[in-house]
Each structure stands twice: as structure tokens, then as C-alpha cells.
Amino acid sequence: QQSFLTSRSNPMKNANSRGFTLIELMIVVAILAIVMSVAIPNYQAYGIRTNRSEAISNMLELSQWMERQFTVFGSYNDPGIAAPPITTSPKTAASGGATINYLLSNSSTAITYTITATPQANQTNDSCGTLSIDQASRECITGGAICSDDASASNRTQVRQCFTGK
């Protein structure tokens, strides 16, 4: 007959002892590693798409502002036009507290403008690269190298995917 102290002091001798073996723990670690190797890149890609979508929204807002200025002044670059109200994406990043994902810039002549969103920080990993839109609603990616009015259907598809996510 075993005493209470004997069975408690050496649980390996107890036939009813429970626990996990090293193999079982290694299987769990391997499964977690596989799940994480899929989940983390998908989460990062989701963040990049979300930030890009916000930048496009800010670009369209700035485009509407440019059109209002043209309506008032008859020119996109009239000296009376105030500085653009949006210079970063997200908009609140300029006042501090948030990471700047894109820098928004505007170049204009009397009858044309191009709004450009240049990726910053983690957004530089975005395959769409620098985004731009002009007064004719021509959308471009990768710094203007591929645009929505290209002759190549695959280029137009790539631009559509970057600007709409579809």
C-alpha cells in the first residue's frame, strides 16, 4: 500500500498521472506555426488594402476640392487658391497621433491637375506603389507607369484592382 506522500512526491510512478508528452506539445506548436504563417501575411495585406482605400478616398476628396476651386477661380492654379486641405492619409495624421500612410501632393496648371499619393512607412510594401488621379479621372499606379486608359487590358485590370479592390 502506497502512502499519500509517496504517490505525491513522484508522480511519474503513478499510473493515473495525466499531462502532455513532448510530442503532443511539439504538434501543437507546429500547428500554431502553420496557422500564424498564413494569418499574419493575410492580416498585413488587409491593412495595406485598408490604408490604400483610405488614401484613394482622400485623393477623391482633394479632387473635388480642386474642381470647386476651378469653378470659383476658372483655373486650377490661380494665386487666390488656398493650400490644399489634405496633405496626408489618414487626414488626422498631419495633426499628430497617427502613422502617415501616404503623403498627398498636387501639381497643377491652369487647366490640369494631378493628385499623387506617395506610400510611406509600411505602405511602401504595397504592390500598387504611388497612386495618382488627374482632372480627367485618369487613375494611375506605380508612379504613373500603369494607368486606367492603357491599351493593355491587363494593365487596366491591375489599376482597377488597386483602386477598387476588385
PLM regions: where:
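Conserved alpha-helical elements of the SDR catalytic core
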Residues: A39, Y46, M66
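N-terminal single-pass transmembrane signal-anchor helix
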Residues: M12-Y43
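Short, Lys/Arg-enriched N-terminal segments with co-localized hydrophobic residues
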Residues: Q1-P11
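Alpha-helix exit/C-cap motif
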Residues: R49-S53, L60-A82
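Periplasmic/extracellular, small/polar-rich flexible segments of pilin-like filament-forming proteins
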Residues: Q2-F4, T71-K166
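Residues at secondary-structure transition points
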Residues: S17, R49-S53, S57, S108, ...
